[in-house]
């Protein structure tokens, strides 16, 4: 696990999730799907009140690099027993720089 921060912008404003996390395996399709798992995390913003959401823009901060998030649909789910949260972003518009940390 490493430091990971995702900032998402939608009609409710800016929301973030940050903490220890890592990318999860995702299908190799285009535009890409980004999947992440967080432990020891903190959320801010109204987006986390809904399990499904639309994103206008955003960014991923991982490993000292930043990656833009384009228009996308997202979901999140929380596992209270395991104390982690999973976030999936299904990009609608291809980004200029693809986050290629999925493994």
UniProtKB/Swiss-Prot annotation:
Cellular compartments per GO CC: cell surface; extracellular matrix
Keywords, comma-separated and alphabetical: Cell adhesion, Glycoprotein
Gene Ontology biological-process annotations: cell-cell adhesion; culmination involved in sorocarp development; DNA damage response
Coiled-coil features, chain-numbered ranges: none
InterPro entries per the UniProt record, alphabetical: Dicty_CAD
One Pfam family, short name: Dicty_CAD
The record's account of how the chain is modified after translation: O-glycosylated.
Superkingdom of origin organism: Eukaryota
Subcellular compartments: Cell surface
Role: Cell-cell adhesion during early development.
Family: Belongs to the csb family.
Descriptive protein name: Glycoprotein 24B
Organism of provenance: Dictyostelium discoideum
Primary gene name: csbB
């Amino acid at each position: 696990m490493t430091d990971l921060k995702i900032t998402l912008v939608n009609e409710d404003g800016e929301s973030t999730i940050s903490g220890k996390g890592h990318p999860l395996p995702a299908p190799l399709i285009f535009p890409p799907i980004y999947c992440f798992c967080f432990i020891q995390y903190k959320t801010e913003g109204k987006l986390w009140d809904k399990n499904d959401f639309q994103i206008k823009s955003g960014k991923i901060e991982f490993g000292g690099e930043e990656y833009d998030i384009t228009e996308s649909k997202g979901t999140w789910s929380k596992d209270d027993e395991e104390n982690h949260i999973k976030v999936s972003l299904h990009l609608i518009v291809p980004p200029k720089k693809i986050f290629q940390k999925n493994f």
